[in-house]
């Protein structure tokens, strides 16, 4: 019972979870005030509306990759067995197109003390979208409090961004433009 207020607060901040919706609804129907608060919060979309607003301007340093960077450049298929370990898998991001990318991004962060914006001509074509976003955000994103080995945020600029990669980047908490 002592954890109920903390659990309710955290559940309100999650995107509606179909895995636990029925459990929360049943508790709500039985008069549980915490479950009622969660249901109301989900119905109002507070998991989204309570997020910080996008700032008027973003100061960052640019890491530019010319040409087409596809999902295999961000998440090489031959290393698919490491995808579950995001920090490890992110180390091999860049593949043949920009093999020193992770080091160059880190060097830019260290030199300018600014977040790095990834810029490409064509970004995110291919099929390994989520692992590609995970790898890229590991290098340009920010830690998610209390969620180990996962990051969100970061700006991705592209003359063309593959539509499904664009959506996946948004869903991952990035700002694709």
Language-model segments: which ranges?
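Fe-S-dependent hydro-lyases/dehydratases of central metabolism
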Residues: 4-5, 9-177
């Amino acid at each position: 019972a002592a954890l109920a207020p903390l659990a309710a607060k955290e559940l309100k901040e999650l995107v509606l979870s179909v895995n636990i919706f029925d459990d929360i609804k049943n508790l709500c129907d039985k008069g549980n005030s915490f479950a009622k608060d969660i249901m109301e919060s989900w119905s109002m979309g507070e998991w989204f509306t309570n997020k910080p607003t996008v700032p008027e301007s973003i100061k960052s340093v640019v890491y530019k990759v010319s040409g087409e960077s596809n999902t295999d450049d961000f998440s090489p298929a031959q290393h698919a067995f490491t995808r579950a370990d995001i920090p490890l898998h992110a180390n091999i991001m860049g593949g043949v197109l920009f093999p020193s990318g992770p080091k160059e991004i880190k060097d830019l962060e260290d030199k300018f003390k600014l977040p790095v914006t990834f810029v490409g001509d064509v970004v995110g074509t291919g099929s390994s979208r989520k692992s590609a976003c995970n790898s890229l955000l590991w290098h340009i994103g920010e830690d998610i409090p209390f969620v180990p080995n996962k990051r969100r945020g970061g700006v991705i600029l592209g003359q063309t961004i593959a539509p499904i990669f664009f959506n996946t980047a948004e869903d991952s908490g990035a700002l694709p433009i």
